[in-house]
């Protein structure tokens, strides 16, 4: 039996059983590895899961200078989306900065996404460039918020950072403050620097009302998030109202690690509703 035939049979089985294909897009400095708990739970329930390593992230071997353009950074996600059959729709889930990639994938492949889920994630408005949201985020952060994170500022200190690498103290006290020690140790071993692509994200028509704006969007508020504080999450929701807002209590920033069971159930409910 050919791979294509097997794929078609698996897809048919998923449709018959009301199963779904979840595609995960990680945030800055992370990789596909951060979804391992959630992916395992969804697979046990019969769903298909694809966790993407974006350019220079996770097991992607490219160095930071090799993914200087956002097209190189998002290439693994866009190539995967392009490879999907025209009749298949996926549930696209972006976390934190991964919301930018999620919105751009929804823009490029609107017919292949049943719903875009923003997990405490950047959710840009179709009327303004994503860079506006990035700038708003950094403007709202209090002085000293970044602790020992390492930044570069190619556009000058008056502009948002060009790249970031999360520091050990920042991980312990903010990003992974709700996580188990094992999760923190894994993160500290696998962190990689990431570009923020703010200059490129300032381009007009990167996202449009007709494509990204026509898609279904659900925002999941993560209570106790110390990286994307609830004030900023709520501002993004009011700035560009999604079709639905969900909430996970005491999740912190890394809900896929702190609340994998609750998040798994929530994703399945959302996927079923917007199937």
Swiss-Prot record:
Pfam short name (any one): Abhydrolase_6
EC number(s) given by UniProt: 3.1.1.-
Lineage, highest ranks first: Eukaryota, Viridiplantae, Streptophyta, Embryophyta, Tracheophyta
Source organism of this protein record: Arabidopsis thaliana
Pathway: Plant hormone biosynthesis; Lipid metabolism; oxylipin biosynthesis
GO terms of molecular function: hydrolase activity, acting on ester bonds; methyl jasmonate esterase activity
Function: Methylesterase shown to have methyl jasmonate (MeJA) esterase activity in vitro.
Protein name: Methylesterase 10
PANTHER family, alphabetized: METHYLESTERASE 10 (PTHR10992:SF943), METHYLESTERASE FAMILY MEMBER (PTHR10992)
The family this protein is said to belong to: Belongs to the AB hydrolase superfamily. Methylesterase family.
Chemical reaction(s) catalysed: methyl (-)-jasmonate + H2O = jasmonate + methanol + H(+)
Gene3D superfamilies: alpha/beta hydrolase (3.40.50.1820)
Disulfide feature: none
Active site: 96 (acyl-ester intermediate), 225 (charge relay system), 253 (charge relay system)
Keyword list, A-Z: Hydrolase
GO terms under cellular component: cytosol
One example of a Gene Ontology biological process annotation: cellular response to hypoxia
């Amino acid at each position: 039996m050919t791979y294509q035939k097997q794929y078609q049979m698996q897809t048919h089985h998923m449709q018959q059983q009301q199963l779904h294909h979840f595609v995960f897009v990680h945030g800055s400095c992370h990789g596909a590895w951060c979804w391992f708990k959630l992916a395992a739970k969804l697979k046990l329930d019969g769903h298909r899961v694809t966790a993407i390593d974006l350019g220079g992230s996770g097991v992607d071997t490219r160095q930071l200078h090799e993914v200087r353009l956002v097209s190189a950074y998002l290439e693994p996600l866009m190539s995967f989306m392009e490879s999907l059959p025209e009749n298949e729709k996926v549930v696209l889930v972006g976390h934190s900065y991964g919301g930018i990639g999620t919105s751009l994938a929804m823009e490029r492949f609107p017919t292949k996404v049943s719903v875009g889920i923003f997990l405490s994630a950047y959710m840009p408005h179709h009327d303004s460039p994503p860079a506006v949201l990035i700038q708003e985020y950094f403007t709202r952060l209090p002085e000293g918020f970044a602790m020992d994170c390492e930044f570069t500022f190619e556009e000058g200190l008056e502009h948002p950072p060009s790249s970031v690498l999360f520091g050990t103290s920042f991980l312990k006290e903010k990003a992974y403050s709700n996580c188990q020690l094992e999760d923190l140790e894994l993160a500290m071993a696998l962190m990689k620097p990431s570009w923020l692509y703010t200059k490129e994200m300032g381009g007009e028509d990167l996202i449009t009302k007709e494509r990204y704006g026509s898609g279904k969007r659900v925002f999941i508020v993560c209570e106790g998030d110390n990286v994307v504080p609830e004030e900023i999450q709520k501002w993004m929701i009011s700035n560009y109202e999604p079709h639905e807002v969900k909430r996970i209590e005491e999740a912190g920033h890394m809900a896929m690690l702190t609340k994998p069971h609750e998040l798994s159930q929530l994703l399945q409910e959302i996927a079923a509703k917007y199937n």
